From Swiss-Prot:
One of its GO terms (biological process) is sensory perception of sweet taste. This is Taste receptor type 1 member 3. Glycans are attached at N85, N130, N264, N285, N380, N411, N432, N475. It comes from Gorilla gorilla gorilla (Western lowland gorilla). Residues 592-603, 661-682, 751-762, 813-852 are cytoplasmic. Residues 839-852 have a biased composition (Basic and acidic residues). InterPro entries: ANF_lig-bd_rcpt, GPCR_3, GPCR_3_9-Cys_dom, GPCR_3_9-Cys_sf, GPCR_3_C, GPCR_3_Ca_sens_rcpt-rel, GPCR_3_CS, Peripla_BP_I. PROSITE patterns: G_PROTEIN_RECEP_F3_2 (PS00980), G_PROTEIN_RECEP_F3_4 (PS50259). Residues 1-20 form the signal peptide. Its main location: membrane.
Length: 852
């Protein structure tokens, strides 16, 4: 074992720029074990010319070094060594590893993949009818890092049901269990990352964006997923295009140039770039040379941390770069592990001992695995020591170890002896596996994905290299720290990327053209409202609700009816008090002077009955105000018509008596006068009221009024009123009263008055005129007034009718009783009666005898 002094000296030599002797890292990429794990890492990068000139099935030479690939390979080594040193996970067993370079190219990755599938102890893949007992060289594979490679290798491994755990392949298509039944990954799928990106656009109100993707499976599927996510959130993609890979021909490069030109000329200020590192590098290289105006770039995880993209000259002028990176546990011991490992690789004694051990291993048929790894210094890899995918590699190894622990049924004392585990047996324990890595508990879901948080990263330029700053987090929902974001705008204000302005409160969008984000703002009419800011149509309020113009909510309609406290009702109640007071006063006078000639000439008891009926008409007015009820609606018309019929029938008897006395021969007058007084008069009143009862009964049975709530009559209230179902039947209910009034008018209008006598006919004539004027005016007024005021109109008509009859017929008599009692004599009031006519008849007979 090497001493600390030797390690320190080796590490000091390793840190020197351009130092020294080659390392022996390339000899440390495989180690024997009871169970072998394969590893696929991008240790180098191939020259483009090697692909273009390839005419034979030989592998391209990977000459360029990839620091991240080497660090990920070292993370796998560290995880395997930790597991082998633990006594609780695989006690008594050792894991081995066989790590290969993919050069980030499918052509290169296929050779080690075939090697992994070769039969254990050989280099051959035999053809069998059944591979259940087939034991390949490795039990499981860690990697590769990209979706493009995983799409190729995944189908190889899936045929053999060999577990494959990728630490970077995020394409959603890899979640398809029917195509990739043995694929797992320790990174979330692209759908999660793209959902976070769509939430970010929605958070900042960017709904007019450009979406670009690399022209490969990764970019094409990413754009397809993003298009669906954006459409569901009301985000419009103004420009969409694919970025050709660097080795594409000039005609395909021209397409992305056209897209960038359109983006530069439009109002789009935000671009989603879901592309591989090389495609993003090519795009920005052209954008810088063509002086594309600064934008907000929403980056995919593939290029967000790429040194190749970050190091482009002029990249700082491209605008604001935001993107999401998977959050994992911090491997605090990893930087020291790398430093120690590189120090050992620089020590000749260690490398010599390692070379002797390598001689005991099988010859490496793929040649030297990473020759460029032997020519690096610590400075070459120091920038990626805390790369976020390092933990993903670490967790992938622990997932396989935990599944093997479960398969072997290991416990604290060891793992029971049994036949070697086959890959398909291990796969059964990988599904829905829960495992621990770096202090975190992780779990594969049914699609082989893990649920991990994302950090929202912002590029903050410090000199020529940007640093990644945390400005938010996504774990199913997005949380941003806006104050930490530094925008590329001169005033550090958030850029606006919208096709149309945000509609104001109470306005909805009327879409123009093909994009839902381009629209005019239209006001919501009364009775409708805007429910959500992105609505394209106004939502109608419910039947019991209302809203003003440009409203964002509906209000409950309150019930509207003729309330007791309304000014019109209060005025009518004052009028009612006046009318009822006059009726009671007149009734009191008539009762007090019931035996006087004036009262007897007015009908005596019938006159008092008529006044009582007028009082009942006044009281019936109280049925109209207030919230209507079914009983109230049914009682309004009968209880107001019947008392009026009783009053008019008594006046009809007065008119008939005056007509008989004045216009008919004395012989007829004597015969009819008895029918107009006494019991016969009451019979006439009863018959008139029975006719009215019959009409009212028919009205209530055939067309009963009902309480209805009208939701449309008033803009903000619900009108509750008694609805008349038939205006014809309503008019017929007035027929008895109208007929009695008309007969009264005819019986008194042309009657000759007698000199020196009280003109009873005149009072009746004016009373009937008041009746007709009131009810004739009532009809057009009722038809044109608001429905809510119709009860007030009928109240007013009844009270005016009562006051008209009082003023024309009863009050003059009351005046005579009070102010001129001397006229209250039989000669003044009863002279025109039948007795007087008989006296005049006798006088005429005597004069005839004298003449003879």
């Amino acid at each position: 074992m090497l001493g600390p002094a030797v390690l320190g000296l080796s590490l000091w030599a390793l840190l020197q720029p351009g130092a020294g002797a080659p390392l022996c890292l390339s000899q440390q990429l495989r180690m024997k074990g009871d169970y072998m794990l394969g590893g696929l890492f991008p240790l180098g990068e191939a020259e483009e010319a090697g692909f273009r000139s390839r005419t034979r099935p030989s592998s391209p030479v990977c000459t360029r070094f990839s620091s991240n690939g080497l660090l990920w390979a070292l993370a796998m080594k560290m995880a395997v060594e930790e597991i082998n040193n633990k006594s609780d996970l695989l006690p008594g067993l050792r894991l081995g590893y066989d790590l290969f370079d993919t050069c980030s190219e499918p052509v290169v990755a296929m050779k080690p993949s075939l090697m992994f599938l070769a039969k254990a102890g050989s280099r051959d893949i035999a053809a069998y009818c059944n591979y259940t007992q087939y034991q390949p060289r490795v039990l499981a594979v860690i990697g590769p890092h990209s979706s493009e490679l995983a799409m190729v290798t995944g189908k190889f491994f899936s045929f053999f049901l060999m577990p494959q755990v990728s630490y970077g392949a995020s394409m959603e298509l890899l979640s398809a269990r029917e195509t990739f039944p043995s694929f797992f990954r320790t990174v979330p799928s692209d759908r999660v990352q793209l959902t976070a990106a769509a939430e970010l656009l929605q958070e900042f109100g960017w709904n007019w964006v450009a979406a670009l993707g690399s022209d490969d499976e990764y970019g094409r599927q990413g754009l397809s997923i993003f298009s669906a996510l954006a459409a569901a959130r009301g985000i419009c993609i103004a420009h969409e295009g694919l970025v050709p890979l660097p080795r594409a021909d000039d005609s395909r490069l021209g397409k992305v140039q056209d897209v960038l030109h359109q983006v530069n000329q439009s109002s789009v200020q935000v671009v989603l770039l879901f592309a591989s590192v090389h495609a993003a590098h090519a795009l920005f290289n052209y954008s810088i040379s063509s002086r594309l105006s600064p934008k907000v770039w929403v980056a995919s995880e593939a290029w967000l941390t790429s040194d190749l993209v970050m190091g482009l000259p002029g990249m700082a002028q491209m605008g604001t770069v935001l993107g999401f990176l998977q959050r994992g546990a911090q491997l605090h011991e990893f930087p020291q592990y790398v430093k120690t490992h590189l120090a050992l690789a620089a020590d000749p004694a260690f490398c010599s001992a390692l070379g002797e051990r390598e001689q005991g291993l099988e010859e490496d048929v793929v040649g030297q695995r990473c020759p460029q790894c032997d020519c690096i210094t610590l400075q070459n890899v120091s920038a990626g020591l805390n790369h976020h995918q390092t933990f993903s590699v670490y967790a992938a190894v622990y997932s396989v170890a935990q599944a093997l622990h479960n398969t072997l049924q290991c416990n604290a004392s060891g793992c029971p002896a049994q036949d070697p585990v086959k890959p398909w047996q291990l796969l059964e324990n990988m599904y829905n596996l829960t495992f621990h890595a770096g202090g975190l508990m992780l779990r594969f879901d049914s699609s082989g994905n893990v649920d991990m948080e994302y950090d929202l990263k912002l590029w903050v330029w410090q000199g020529s290299v940007p640093r990644l700053h945390d400005v938010g987090r996504f774990n199913g929902s997005l949380r941003t720290e806006r104050l930490k974001i530094r925008w590329h705008t001169s005033d550090n204000q958030k850029p606006v990327s919208r096709c149309s302005r945000q509609c104001q409160e109470g306005q909805v969008r009327r879409v123009k053209g093909f994009h839902s984000c381009c629209y005019d703002c239209v006001d919501c009419e009364a009775g409708s409202y805007r429910q959500n800011p992105d609505d394209v149509t106004c939502t109608s309020c419910g039947q019991d609700e209302w809203s003003p113009e440009r409203s964002t909510r509906c209000f409950h309609r309150r019930s509207r009816f003729l309330a007791w406290g309304e000014p019109a009702v209060l005025l009518l109640l004052l009028l009612l008090s006046l009318a009822l007071g006059l009726v009671l006063a007149a009734l009191g006078l008539f009762v007090h002077h019931r035996d006087s000639p004036l009262v007897q000439a007015s009908g005596g008891p019938l006159a008092c009955f008529g006044l009582v009926c007028l009082g009942l008409v006044c009281l019936s007015v109280l049925l109209f105000p207030g919230q209507p009820s079914p009983a109230q609606c049914l009682a309004q018309q009968p209880l107001s018509h019947l008392p009026l019929t009783g009053c008019l029938s008594t006046l009809f008897l007065q008119a008939a008596e005056i007509f008989v006395e004045s216009e008919l021969p004395l012989s007829w007058a004597d015969r009819l006068s008895g029918c107009l007084r006494g019991p016969w008069a009451w019979l006439v009143v009863l018959l008139a009221m029975l006719v009215e009862v019959a009409l009212c009964t028919w009205y209530l049975v055939a067309f009963p009024p009902e309480v209805v709530t009208d939701w449309h009559m008033l803009p903000t209230e619900a009108l509750v009123h008694c609805r008349t179902r038939s205006w014809v039947s309503f008019g017929l209910a007035h027929a008895t009263n109208a007929t009695l009034a008309f007969l009264c008018f005819l019986g008194t209008f042309l009657v000759r008055s007698q000199p020196g006598r009280y003109n009873r006919a005149r009072g009746l004539t004016f009373a009937m005129l008041a009746y007709f004027i009131t009810w004739v005016s009532f009809v057009p007024l009722l038809a044109n007034v608001q429905v809510v005021l119709r009860p007030a109109v009928q109240m007013g008509a009844l009270l005016l009718c009562v006051l008209g009859i009082l003023a024309a017929f009863h009050l003059p008599r009351c005046y005579l009783l009070i102010r001129q009692p001397g006229l209250n004599t039989p000669e003044f009031f009863l002279g025109g009666g039948p007795g007087d006519a008989q006296g005049r008849n006798d006088g005429d007979t005597g004069n005839q005898g004298k003449h003879e």
